[in-house]
């Protein structure tokens, strides 16, 4: 965002129409600038685009005082810097692989970070190899096909019944690109009482902020070509373990789907009971 302000010599004097826009927007921006000379304007704009797209994407504000618009300078072209994308560290991937290998009823939750990172392909590969039910936050809608056999629907404030049962019964909750805000789950222990949490996110400040995690992977898991980085988290044998649910669509065969994805003995027994009574 680019804003205008009073001239530099009028800043800090309670001038007419002056506003500390940098201070006002600080809580809602990733970074902001006040341009002090026309010579630094081009560099500031380039740097703003770099920081906006690096790591977790976010808004940048550039405040330009009035007198800067009246000045001129020579424009010096510069090459574009590629955004910084932190790679996941090896120890985090090992910890993730360990909790995934131990899980019997994992549940995947896809958030808006998947869309921001352009990692929908990698997330789908991850889910299909794991063969676990997948729910999407409101910001994550579009990160995974809604008509996919593994998709349970939306999680959070307005979830589907299948999503609730899958979350309540899982023994490992895998949050990918989500902040675990109250819109997702106000009480982690209440929603998934038996579950450990694996958090995968590009922003280190979000890890463990709203939910205690058993393992975490911090970095950009978007891969190149046919080798998605997310596959590094998947131990061999997970596909075989959960292959029984392959081809079962929650909307078409919800009872079979729930018997796979729910760890709750009560829910599993209910599903079996209802299934036998229907048959």
Which positions does each model-derived feature cover?
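Short, compositionally biased segments
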Residues: 223-231, 236, 241-244
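Alpha-helix boundary/capping motif
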Residues: 227-232, 250-253, 263, 267-271
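Hydrophobic helix segments
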Residues: 229-232, 258-259, 276
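Low-complexity, glycine/proline/serine-enriched flexible coil segments
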Residues: 235-239, 249-258
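Compositionally biased, low-complexity intrinsically disordered regions
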Residues: 242-243, 247, 269, 273
